[in-house]
Amino acid sequence: MKFTFNHTNLNVRDLQRSIDFYAEALGLHVVREHEAPDGSFKLAFLSDGTSDYRLELTWLRDHADSDYNLGENETHMCFTAADYDAAHEHHAKMGCICFENTAMGLYFISDPDGYWFEIVR
């Protein structure tokens, strides 16, 4: 039996704000969207353009005005930067670097909802 990665889901409070953040911070773009007929949820699937793996952003109407409990934020996705120094400079200008370990050559960025993403060389 074999499995392959498909997607990771994150619930967000403002779908467009999150789409804009991921486009600017990580170069991800929307490849598919879906909205429930009753308007109770909206989905946006983002891609890096090089793999079939997707980041699914979910907006829930009944949860749009309250923060999600992210626990201790130890679960995260990691991205490899083709140009680490340029990526670091870009994220520093955006003001989204939330943790850095220069000895290990990595840092984390935080999205508008507080999710952390690791950036490595």
Regions found by a protein language model. Give the residues of each.
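Helix N-cap motif at beta-to-alpha junctions
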Residues: D14-L15, A81-Y84
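Short amphipathic alpha-helices within nucleic acid-binding modules
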Residues: F21, D85-H90
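Short hydrophobic-acidic sequence motifs that mark active-site Asp/Glu residues
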Residues: R54-E56, W116
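Core segments of cupin and vicinal oxygen chelate
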Residues: K2, N9-D52, Y107-F108
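Short, charged/polar surface micro-motifs in flexible loops or helix N-caps
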Residues: G49-Y53, D62-A64, Y84-D85
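Acetyl-CoA-dependent GNAT
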Residues: T58-H63, R121
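Eukaryotic phosphotyrosine signaling hubs
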Residues: F5-H7, E72-H76
